[in-house]
């Protein structure tokens, strides 16, 4: 059986789809998946053993110059790659009109997705041949697992979902694996940032622990923040610019991770590493860290500025058994 997945973004959403593949792989021996995903996240599906072909799409970039000759050529090549197979099923796990119209509609195969009541954008359901009712008040991982089970005709397992990508990195861990913590400090929303002075205070409080700390970054302004956080601390390393796979390798070797609510926090969860995520305004119940050893540290009044470094340090100590 060959199935096409349409789940293009974001990083967390793409990662949250992986346990559904593991369920399907266990329920339907020999099943293989192709996956349409935004080019920036194209490495992620390749880490799962059930994925045979990754088809990158660049809707975010294309829409800036949709009718230019180079972009038209890219769109034509994408359509040819998408239509090269006749699929037993096409599962649109994105639930948005944009992806349904520009990707799902063009694919060959019976198209499955969430129904009018439960799709993220109800109009997207008009592009599906089979519409499935998937209750909204459950974690995103469980919603996707249920969608795959209903689309492919098996019962959703009652056990916790398995991302099944940690083993991809086990044979190539950093030489200092287990000797450091990683602090993913960057996120896209201002109200999800933990103040820099709190990060620096936490780093100082860990001085006697013997643990080294690594700071990842993606954009230039994130690198500047990382440098400010590391200033004056000999045991803190600002990582070089890395591919997503490179960052994943560092996370896979971490003793533990302290993170804001960001894509790298979800990647840590997918790699089964102990992870303390500090939450302010977002609800971890529906889109938070999912998996083994995932710990939620809520800010008082949902205001991250009110969450002190001492409180996070105590949280680390109280959960030492999981770390």
Segments (PLM) and residue ranges:
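Catalytic machinery of carbohydrate-active enzymes
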Residues: 1-323
């Amino acid at each position: 059986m060959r199935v096409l997945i349409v789940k293009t973004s974001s990083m967390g959403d793409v990662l949250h789809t992986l346990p559904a593949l593991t369920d399907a792989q266990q329920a339907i021996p020999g099943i293989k998946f192709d996956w349409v995903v935004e080019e920036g996240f194209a490495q992620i599906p390749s880490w799962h053993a059930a994925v045979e072909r990754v088809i990158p799409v660049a809707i975010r970039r294309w829409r800036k110059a949709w009718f230019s000759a180079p972009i038209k050529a890219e769109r034509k090549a994408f359509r040819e790659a998408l239509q090269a197979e006749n699929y037993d099923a096409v599962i649109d796990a994105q639930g948005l009109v944009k992806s349904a119209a520009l990707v799902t509609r063009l694919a060959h195969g019976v198209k499955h997705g969430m129904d009018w009541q439960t799709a993220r954008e109800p109009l997207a359901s008009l592009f599906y041949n089979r519409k499935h009712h998937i209750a909204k008040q459950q974690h995103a991982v469980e919603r996707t697992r249920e969608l795959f089970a209903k689309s492919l005709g098996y019962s959703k397992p009652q056990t916790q979902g398995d991302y099944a990508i940690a083993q991809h990195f086990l044979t190539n861990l950093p030489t200092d694996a287990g000797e450091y913590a990683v602090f993913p400090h960057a996120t896209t929303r201002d109200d999800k940032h933990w103040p820099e002075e709190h990060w620096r205070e936490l780093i100082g409080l860990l001085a006697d622990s013997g643990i080294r700390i690594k700071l990842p970054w993606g954009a230039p302004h994130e690198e500047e923040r990382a440098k400010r956080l590391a200033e004056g601390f000999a045991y803190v390393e600002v990582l070089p610019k890395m591919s997503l796979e490179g960052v994943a390798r560092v996370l896979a070797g971490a003793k533990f991770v302290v993170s804001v609510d960001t894509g790298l926090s979800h990647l840590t969860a997918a790699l089964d590493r102990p992870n303390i995520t500090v939450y302010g305004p977002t609800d971890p119940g529906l889109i938070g860290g999912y998996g083994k050893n995932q710990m939620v540290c809520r800010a008082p009044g949902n205001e991250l500025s009110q969450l002190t470094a001492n409180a996070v340090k105590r949280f680390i100590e109280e959960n030492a058994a999981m770390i």
